[in-house]
From Swiss-Prot:
Its EC number is 4.2.1.20. This is Tryptophan synthase alpha chain. The alpha subunit is responsible for the aldol cleavage of indoleglycerol phosphate to indole and glyceraldehyde 3-phosphate. One of its GO terms (cellular component) is cytosol. The active site is at E49 (proton acceptor), D60 (proton acceptor). Belongs to the TrpA family. Pathway: Amino-acid biosynthesis; L-tryptophan biosynthesis; L-tryptophan from chorismate: step 5/5.
Amino acid sequence: MSRYDDLFARLDTAGEGAFVPFIMLSDPSPEEAFQIISTAIEAGADALELGVPFSDPVADGPTVAESHLRALDGGATVDSALEQIKRVRAAYPEVPIGMLIYGNVPFTRGLDRFYQEFAEAGADSILLPDVPVREGAPFSAAAAAAGIDPIYIAPANASEKTLEGVSAASKGYIYAISRDGVTGTERESSTDGLSAVVDNIKKFDGAPIFLGFGISSPQHVADAIAAGASGAITGSAITKIIASHCEGEHPNPSTIRDMDGLKKDLTEFISAMKAATKKV
């Protein structure tokens, strides 16, 4: 069984959904990012979605885009990301690690090398937010060869053909978005129609569904679980907490001015979000 299979079996027994934080690697530095990731797991995160910094993050709103920039200002590289994943995997051998990486990275490194490197580092899945499922065949093939679960996005208003393709191609989980647009708490998740979004995907008997985009409160998490999702992913709300503790101006590197304060704020937020995954 994969780490995702083990996670879903455990959560089903506990009557819970998954809470998955998105955290940018190297934001604002590799060491500080590792402390943030460790805090998230200790606070109750069930799995991780880790970002690899990129200069043109088209799927991300301003909050997450700024985290890409902070990481790049600090000298972030793909090689550094791989080393950070290895460290997280060594510290947390059972936690599923999903990656969010823009498609230029695998093109630059070569698909087979790219997926093999991330598999060897300890990643379980990779989502390329700018690669739609209709263009995904070569990525899925390279992922399968490396033992990585490919993840595709199920858009909120997708056609049945697209949802069928996403359900067939996604392994580990399906990333369903609760509304169209870019990531961010600037536009909160709409809870209207969440059940329809989930039900439309479930018709095709694919992997468990995680809902994301604009999930920023315990109520959003509870609504996602009530709608039939197996979990919820939160990125921008967590990134805002991190940013509020950063000091430094682009293009200079940033640093966390009060790590203990950041850990406290993250723990409170993530604990509340995880508590909201309890099925009623």
